[in-house]
């Protein structure tokens, strides 16, 4: 599992650097990439959530209940955007302070990671090639089953799933075994380097304790500064939740009346 995590980390770093190479931009730091990734992830969740709400409202059940979830979702999204704007300067100050305090440690770790990445890259290329081969083999095995499913009846769904599961498990096991076999030594090397760095920090005068104390202090300050924005969020959510509650109760009451009338 550690080897898999290392693989994903190296792939993420390598892919990000390649993008800046082709675009001729200044490469982002790992810190900036983490923050950008978090922002993109949150936006994707928000957009996909709105799509699900819209699909539900367009369904027959959604039209019958008439909960107006989409309006409430937009109100909630607007409230969250305002809160994020209020917290922006506070969180930026926190990230800047934390980045400054850990700059030396991150610089050493980036150097170690770059060395490991250079050693691992040939194995990653080989893994990608083998992965494509395994996927093609899996596709060839699954193709007849897919055709059989299309020709069969619905009651064969469970049977098809039972037959597909061993093939999928076989593919996962092969990929995991290959990664662990090829990358485990490099994962151990990186872990040993990190342990050595941390031991050096301990021997150098309690830098780790200082990092922990400063991070705790900054988190406490962040919590105090965020209280007004979080209170605004709570006040903004109350009308949305109340409206949703009223809509649900009205829908239940309407359904009860229809059942009693029958």
Curated annotation (Swiss-Prot):
One of its GO terms (biological process) is protein stabilization. Major protein of plasma HDL, also found in chylomicrons. Glycosylated. Palmitoylated. It is found in: Secreted. This is Apolipoprotein A-I. Its main location: secreted. Residues 67-262 are annotated as: 10 X approximate tandem repeats. Homodimer. Interacts with APOA1BP and CLU. Component of a sperm activating protein complex (SPAP), consisting of APOA1, an immunoglobulin heavy chain, an immunoglobulin light chain and albumin. Interacts with NDRG1. Interacts with SCGB3A2. Interacts with NAXE and YJEFN3. Participates in the reverse transport of cholesterol from tissues to the liver for excretion by promoting cholesterol efflux from tissues and by acting as a cofactor for the lecithin cholesterol acyltransferase (LCAT). As part of the SPAP complex, activates spermatozoa motility. The modification Methionine sulfoxide is found at residues 109, 238.
